[in-house]
Structure formats: C-alpha cells, structure tokens
Amino acid sequence: MALVPVGMAPRQMRVNRCIFASIVSFDACITYKSPCSPDAYHDDGWFICNNHLIKRFKMSKMVLPIFDEDDNQFKMTIARHLVGNKERGIKRILIPSATNYQDVFNLNSMMQAEQLIFHLIYNNENAVNTICDNLKYTEGFTSNTQRVIHSVYATTKSILDTTNPNTFCSRVSRDELRFFDVTNARALRGGAGDQLFNNYSGFLQNLIRRAVAPEYLQIDTEELRFRNCATCIIDETGLVASVPDGPELYNPIRSSDIMRSQPNRLQIRNVLKFEGDTRELDRTLSGYEEYPTYVPLFLGYQIINSENNFLRNDFIPRANPNATLGGGAVAGPAPGVAGEAGGGIAV
C-alpha cells in the first residue's frame, strides 16, 4: 500500500507506464497492439495498467481512503483479488515465485514478447537468452525482428530500473518499516514471509507494496487498525489469495471482472444464483449503502515515522532509498503501542 501521487501536469507528455505496453509480435506479418486500459497513462506508481493486472495477476486496483480528525482524506493504493472462494491450488496464486511463475502464468501459451517481459521481470537470464537464440534463426531477424526485440527489451528494462530500489535516484519508497509476517513483527524482526518477499525483483516488490495494505498502520504513536485478520499470505509459491486459517472468504466474481479475450473458448462455471421475486425487498433496502463483498488484500504490519513526511508523493527520492526491512531508516514503535494489539502493520 502506498500514497497515491498527485499525478502529472496537464501539459506533460502522455507516457504509457504499463510494463506490458511494449508487447508486439516478433512476426512482421502480424499486427498487434497491447490492450492497455486508460490508467496506463497515470503516474500512480503501479507500472502496470488495470487490464493487465486483472488478466495476468488476478487483481484489480482500488484505493483505501484514510480520514484524519478534520475529515481530510488521504487515499492509499490497494487491490482486491479476483479469485473465487471455490478456487483451489494454483488458481489462488496472484504473484507466483521465481520457481513456478512459468507454470502459473502458462507462459508457453503467450506471445514471445510477453514471455520475454515476464522472464525479465523474474530476472531469468537463461530464458531471455533462449528466446533471443531461437529468434536468430527466423527469417528477417537482422532486417526487422532484432530491432523490435531491442525496443521491447529497452522499454521493459527502463521500467524495471525505475522500480529497482538500488537504482540511482530510484522512485520507489523504502524508508518505512514493513512486515509481511507478523510473527516477529512486534519485536521489529521479519519472519518467513518477509524473507520470501525479499526474494522478489524490485518490480514485483513494488507491485506487492502497492496491492497489499497493512492490517495495522502505525504513524509514530498513532495506530490504525484496518483489519483484524490477513486476507492473503506470502509463502513459497508466491502471494496467495488465501486466509491463514479457516475457509476462504466469500468473494463473488462479477462478469465485469472476467477478461473475455477468448470469445471462442468454452468455459464452464459453477455459480450461485437466486430466483424469485425480490423486487419488494429491493425497494425496501434500496436507500441504504451497500456493503462491498469483494476481498481487498490486507497483510502484515507497517510502521512510519512522521519525520519521513509520509503524506507527500512517495516517488520523491528519500535520503536513504536503500532502507529495507529491519534497517535503521525509521524509529521503532513507541512503548506500549506496538505490543497492545494482536496483529501487525504492513503494506
């Protein structure tokens, strides 16, 4: 979870910031344009448009509003997952790990340009070189294909460098304490979930930080409790849309959440459907606000020190951009605050 930046100026050049925007066919006879949604031109810090987030990572962008005592509203980034409560196994994985991403994404069914982007995201140099070696034997490689490959590679690497916290003047924030495993969070030590999080590339770490909000957020001595339980976990398979204990949360998937990119494909769905005359009940309750039944992603524990000016655009480079979990960039929780509630703080 992160603060939504102010955005770009009206006169600023419109730039597609989605990492999948450069997808093209390596076959000169095929014309293809990546179907990005309009938010791809928003400087929101996701570096992926909502269309591709839904299609590839089974998540959809949202905002989490936070109000202060004067009713001022600050919107934080968060995502809701699009995994039904009846789904099991590999279908519940939102962001897979480096060991299983090719199977989870079914990479062999994608265009080579999209495969190349995923391999770059997961730092799989061997797979990247394999694609290049295979394309060298295609017709028109030197006259056309090589130029297209370099364009896709350069555009993707530019975004990956932007989301790498170790890059000079990186635009991603790393100056807050954030835990994705609350087991040792009260002692300001990371757990297994945090170690697994650190194995991800900078792009995927930024994506998780944007998509997953904390159960608890502590700003100095002020503690905000958003949820009393996690709605996702990070394990060896990746970021998974599963609760730590008990049955999965009810999460109905609307028809608008389904990407219908394959109209000729037969898909069988077992859905819950109500029948009968409900108009009278609808009229009685129509004046009340509806409670959303979808499941936003909450996990862990986050601590922010007000000296870091949390409420500013977090794309502005910090004094210590390389501060990571357990580092000395921020102060620990005040006595009697971090140990009172039963959860943690994270983003």
Swiss-Prot record:
The keyword Transcription does not apply. One of its GO terms (cellular component) is viral capsid. It is found in: Virion. Keywords: Capsid protein, Late protein, Virion. It comes from the Viruses. The keyword Cell division does not apply. One of its GO terms (molecular function) is structural molecule activity. Its main location: virion. It holds the Pfam family Baculo_VP39. Belongs to the baculoviridae major capsid protein family. Expressed late in infection. Most abundant structural protein of the nucleocapsid produced during the infection cycle. The monomers are arranged in stacked rings around the nucleoprotein core. This is Major capsid protein. It comes from Autographa californica nuclear polyhedrosis virus (AcMNPV). The lineage of its organism: Viruses, Viruses incertae sedis, Naldaviricetes, Lefavirales, Baculoviridae.
